[in-house]
UniProtKB/Swiss-Prot annotation:
This is ETS-related transcription factor Elf-1. InterPro entries: Ets_dom, ETS_fam, TF_Elf_N, WH-like_DNA-bd_sf, WH_DNA-bd_sf. It comes from the Eukaryota. GO terms for cellular component: chromatin; nucleoplasm; nucleus. Residues 158-199, 300-366, 564-592 are annotated as: Disordered. Disulfide bonds: none annotated. Transmembrane segments: none annotated. Belongs to the ETS family. Transcription factor that activates the LYN and BLK promoters. Appears to be required for the T-cell-receptor-mediated trans activation of HIV-2 gene expression. Binds specifically to two purine-rich motifs in the HIV-2 enhancer. It is found in: Nucleus.
């Protein structure tokens, strides 16, 4: 008797020749070994259930075709009972032999109705789809001692390997998103066309809040002075100049064309509770940011250009301190000239020429704007010139030494600018005849903080000159001017160089490249004569005046008629080099050579610009 069930049902196969009563069926000694397995081709076995196998081949059951084959012979009184236990076959060539062996087992009668019911249920509930399911083959063996042995073998079916679509997972369906509505066109007359860029906030999306929107408007040139502006920038107080326009901009950003100030005001009141904004009491449409973010772009009302300022108080107060220092550094003209003291700033230290009259001095890095004289009938131009101010000489009323600041709007566009030249403080200059030893003249530059303003250059003051003091030096020199004639006014007086306006311009302007770029090594000797030659550059024909110690060279405002362009220098004099008891010897006019030493770091990258128009925003 043989019965076949599908998948997880047990299959009992046994053979017997003598089964007469139920006692023998219930006795476990009659069935020494039982195999329980899953048959892969159950539908084929069911179709062959009614066929009879007449002859069996001799090699139907062999060790080569079966994985496990056990044979047990039990001696009985009547016949010998032979029980064959098979395992599943794994070779494709022996499948037919396995089917024939199964047919022989199916032809036997069933000893009981229980297995027949399982067979009927299997035929009813089985389907072709169930046949496709691959289940592991389980071998259960029961020995005579009652010890069960279980072995499970995985079986792969070719149908599943051939179908790639079964293993591939199903593709997820696309979710239908909500279509965004196109924005409604706004009238350019009622709603300004202002676009606010959205900022990504660490993956939180592109949502921009109302307070961020207001900050963006405050940093936009098209909206800041017109629709919204700062009233107290340091405290974060701003005012909605045109509340309707701001609300329309917010509605355009939120795609709500019916937005008004009342609706936007409710959102602003929500920020009161959050501690972001506050309403300034007593002022309409004025609000305050509780915390100001850093690196805001502030729009200046007077200047259309914007400047990035930090909210750090130390940095934001730098501009205010500079303005205060500039206002404190105003020098009165009348007491300074009558007292005989002229304020001159040095780059190294901030000391006046005479400490008897203390004056508050600004930093050398500041550039002060020069007030135009009211008596000037034409625009005044600033040139790089030098002017000698006598300490004991009274200045007429026409001249006034003043330094002040003025607004950018009041500056005339024709006013020339004064550029600070990054040069060393000591510029040695050598004046010596060709056949004599060289002597150096040290000049010191003057910062552009004190400007002597003259209304009429032809007023009765001394001529404009350079005073160069000779000191010894043994350093490399740069040729400044050759064939300079020294003329002596009288016997015993220091020789002076007298040049016309064209010669002064040629010396001090055409030789700028020579001073900045080229250096010529000239042998010099530390020894020099007792008479220190004083070089005087006279722009126009006027009487030369002897200058006692303490003479100061500063800059002066020249008119358009004057063509002399020079550097602003300050003469550094030493009383040890000026001897009153000079030898009374007549000196013949002979050519001199003027050279400039580059020993004190006189860089070749000095850029000297002249006649540059002063822009209102240059300061």
């Amino acid at each position: 008797m043989a019965a076949v069930v599908q998948q997880n049902d047990l299959v009992f196969e046994f053979a017997s020749n003598v089964m007469e009563d139920e006692r023998q069926l219930g006795d476990p000694a009659i069935f020494p070994a039982v195999i329980v397995e899953h048959v892969p081709g159950a539908d084929i076995l069911n179709s062959y259930a009614g066929l009879a196998c007449v002859e069996e081949p001799n090699d139907m059951i062999t060790e080569s075709s079966l994985d496990v084959a056990e044979e047990e012979i039990i001696d009985d009184d009547d016949d010998d009972i032979t029980l064959t236990v098979e395992a599943s076959c794994h070779d494709g060539d022996e499948t037919i032999e396995t089917i024939e062996a199964a047919e022989a087992l199916l032809n036997m009668d069933s000893p009981g109705p229980m297995l027949d019911e399982k067979r009927i249920n299997n035929n009813i509930f089985s389907s072709p789809e169930d046949d496709m399911v691959v289940a592991p083959v389980t071998h259960v063996s029961v020995t005579l001692d009652g010890i069960p042995e279980v072995m499970e073998t995985q079986q792969v079916q070719e149908k599943y390997a051939d179908s790639p679509g079964a293993s591939s997972p199903e593709q997820p369906k696309r979710k239908k998103g909500r279509k965004t509505k196109p924005p409604r066109p706004d009238s350019p007359a009622t709603t300004p066309n202002i676009s606010v860029k959205k900022k990504n906030k660490d993956g939180k999306g592109n949502t921009i809040y109302l307070w961020e929107f207001l900050l963006a408007l405050l940093q936009d040139k098209a909206t800041c002075p017109k629709y919204i502006k700062w009233t107290q920038r340091e405290k974060g107080i701003f005012k909605l100049v045109d509340s309707k326009a701001v609300s329309r901009l917010w509605g355009k950003h939120k795609n709500k064309p019916d937005m008004n100030y009342e609706t936007m005001g409710r959102a602003l009141r929500y920020y009161y509770q959050r501690g972001i904004l506050a309403k300034v009491e007593g002022q309409r449409l004025v609000y305050q940011f509780k915390e100001m973010p850093k690196d805001l772009i502030y729009i200046n009302d007077e200047d259309p250009s914007s400047s990035i300022e930090s909210s750090d108080p130390s940095l934001s107060s730098s501009a205010t301190s500079n303005r205060n220092q500039t206002s404190r550094s105003r020098v009165s003209s009348s007491p300074g000239v009558k007292g005989g003291a002229t304020t001159v700033l040095k780059p190294g230290n901030s000391k006046a020429a005479k400490p008897k009259d203390p004056v508050e001095v600004a930093q050398p890095s500041e550039v002060l704007r020069t007030v135009q004289p009211t008596q000037s009938p034409y625009p005044t131009q600033l040139f790089r010139t030098v002017h000698v101010v006598q300490p004991v000489q009274a200045v007429p009323e026409g001249e006034a030494a003043r330094t002040s600041t003025m607004q950018d709007e009041t500056l005339n566009s024709s006013v020339q600018s004064i550029r600070t030249i990054q040069a060393p403080t000591q510029v040695p200059v050598v004046v010596s005849p060709r056949n004599q030893q060289l002597h150096t003249v040290t000049l010191q530059t003057v910062p552009l903080t004190t400007v002597i303003a003259s209304t009429d250059p032809s007023a009765g003051t001394g001529s404009q000159k350079f005073i160069l003091q000779a000191i010894p030096s043994s350093q490399p020199m740069t040729v400044l001017k050759e064939n300079v004639m020294l003329q002596s006014q009288k016997a015993g007086s220091p020789p002076s160089i007298v040049l016309g306006p064209a010669q002064v311009q040629q010396v001090l302007t055409s030789n700028v490249q020579t001073i900045c770029n080229g250096t010529v090594s000239v042998a010099s000797s530390p020894s020099f004569s007792a008479t220190a030659p004083v070089v005087t550059f006279s722009p126009r024909s006027s009487q030369l005046v002897a200058h006692p110690p303490g003479t100061v060279i500063t800059s002066v405002i020249k008119t358009q008629e004057t063509k002399t362009l020079t550097q602003e220098v300050e003469k550094k004099e030493s009383e040890d080099h000026l001897k009153e008891n000079t030898e009374k010897t007549e000196q013949q006019p002979q050519p001199y050579v003027m050279v400039v030493s580059s020993s004190n770091g006189f860089t070749s990258q000095v850029a000297m610009k002249q006649n540059e128009l002063l822009e209102p925003n240059s300061f």
